[in-house]
Amino acid sequence: MFNVVKKTFAYGDHQVTIETGEVARQAGGAVLVSMEETVVLVTVVAAKNAKPGQDFFPLTVDYQEKTYAAGRIPGGFFKREGRPSEKETLTCRLIDRPIRPLFPDGFYNEVQVIATVMSLNPEIDSDIPALIGASAALAISGVPFNGPIGAARVGYIDGQYVLCPTLSQLKGSQLDLVVAGTEAAVLMVESEADQLSEEVMLGAVVFGHTEMQKAINAINELVEEAGKPEWEWEAAPKDEALVASLSALVSAKLEEAYNITVKQTRSQAVKAIRAEAVAALCTGAEGAPDENTVGNLFHEIEASIVRGRILSGAPRIDGRDTRTVRPITMRSGVLPRTHGSALFTRGETQALAVATLGTNRDEQIIDALAGEYRDRFMLHYNMPPYATGECGRVGTPKRREIGHGRLAKRALLAVLPKPEDFSYSMRLVSEITESNGSSSMASVCGGCLALLDAGVPLKAHVAGIAMGLIKDGNRFAVLTDILGDEDHLGDMDFKVAGSTTGITALQMDIKIQGITKEIMQVALAQAKEARIHILNLMQESAAGPREEMSAYAPRLYTFKINPEKIRDVIGKGGAVIRALTEETGTTIDIQDDGTITIAATSGEAAAAARSRIDAITAEVEIGKIYEGTVLKILDFGAIVSVLPGKDGLLHISQIAQERVNKVEDYVKEGQIVRVKVLETDDRGRVKLSMKAAAADEGTVAQPVAAPEAAVQQQQ
């Protein structure tokens, strides 16, 4: 019934098994990938024909984590998996980026890749098995695909590269790098690092690419035994006569349009040329081309002009050479009521970054499949439609915004202070107010400045730069600080962020079928030159963290109490701590070990809260005189409160030197009396004495004539 084919190979310290033929047999391609009890099912389904009028490649990648994979039941009312988590969204992008450029030009059939995590070993991240599975499922499906690809995670521990480290190993690693590529070349890199050199980063990419050949070989063997026949698909032949007509109509005008350096003006000119060409050629007559065909050919001519000029050594679209960074301006403290803010502008790309400080109560609690954890640093990237002069939907963040925010966060993580040195939680929001290339790297620069403006003691300044590539045969040009058009019409988007010491984040996406080590070396060297230039400007603008925090930022005051006193501070049903926070205007956090953190915008409020907590947690001292309140009258004495939550017995024999017949003759409920602590027994009961306190202070206890009368009088 089942024709099961399995391939197993060693991958670092792990065994990886790729299996097909038993599960999801009606899909175009389906594989189960297992790595040390982490199991991912990946399926591929492709439409046999493109939809009429389709002019783009509709590839969809879905990655979903099932809670049963970790032996858990989902929370919430419905007890089902809900909207994708950030991890799921980022993994979708991780799979999409290396496989998309391997589909042939002109292939517009709908393709859907679904990766489902079915079993999870908390030590083994499911993203690498999902990537390998996507490659294998596509390879055996017969869909036109120039793969397979391999994928590997690389760590850097004690000066050695580690293939596919576990999550425990990653905690001690200076590098977390994911690389994907074909047998011949690298297609995608995603990483965060602890200020590592360009040489170490390049070595990690090469190491990962070398090791992933094991996965590629296993997939090739799987295809030989279980692969479906390749589709008989060919790209539609080009209409050379139409190409010639369109080129004659638009080439000279496009050459002129790409001499315009202002983005909006240039875009309008290009749109007008395109509209003119469509009107001239798409007449509706028999045999006339449709708008999609003309539009695709127009894009090719556009790309040919821009790319040809750069490769010939002519100036770029905005007049720069290949190594020059656009003009940069930056300003900190731009928003008066925020904790920290900065406006970073590079050419026609602008980011307004805002930093907010909070307590550990404000940390994000992430309910991950591998287990719940807290995140003290959040970075959110927003790019509204006005940033590109367009109208559009405003709402929940799209995959692109989540991905860009994660990249900027990776860039800054390495320079954040340790929690013990800076106990605040931090939220950074990057509002992209203008966009013409590399807005994520503008978020890194602006975010660094905003954190410094908020008083965060960063270990170093961090800047980011986006590099591009134009490649034609053996000729290539690496571009520094690419524009949006250069990204759109080029072959690579290579983002590098770091400090003067080294790289903290690196992301590379290739639109052609891979690049070589030589090109990566040139790109990294050029990126370092640009990064140092930007860092110098940033250090001139903000040499270090602001000494005095914003008046609106919370001040944190931390101290410890006896853990046994925690319940006294919290009170029954939280009544005590709730009253404390409301009456002092502070936020109070208590840890299980007795560490208390008071967050307040003024020192006076924090001091008031500290004083009240000290009073609640104070221990009664034997021999000390206290001013207490009479809580209750008894036949044999009175109950007196000497500290919050600390009551003692004032026995009738300890009220006055003379004999006391009735307690009410000397004390009344609610009155303030001075008492001395005589002793406490092993059960914590406190014995008090008015007459001992009076003797020590030279006073005498007198009977009261009325409730308002003084209990004690000076001799």
From Swiss-Prot:
Its cofactor is Mg(2+). It comes from the Bacteria. One of its GO terms (cellular component) is cytosol. It catalyses: RNA(n+1) + phosphate = RNA(n) + a ribonucleoside 5'-diphosphate. Gene3D superfamilies: GHMP Kinase, N-terminal domain, K Homology domain, type 1, Nucleic acid-binding proteins. InterPro entries: ExoRNase_PH_dom1, ExoRNase_PH_dom2, ExoRNase_PH_dom2_sf, KH_dom, KH_dom_type_1, KH_dom_type_1_sf, NA-bd_OB-fold, PNPase. Residues 623-691 form the S1 motif domain. GO terms for biological process: mRNA catabolic process; RNA processing. This is Polyribonucleotide nucleotidyltransferase. It comes from Dechloromonas aromatica (strain RCB).
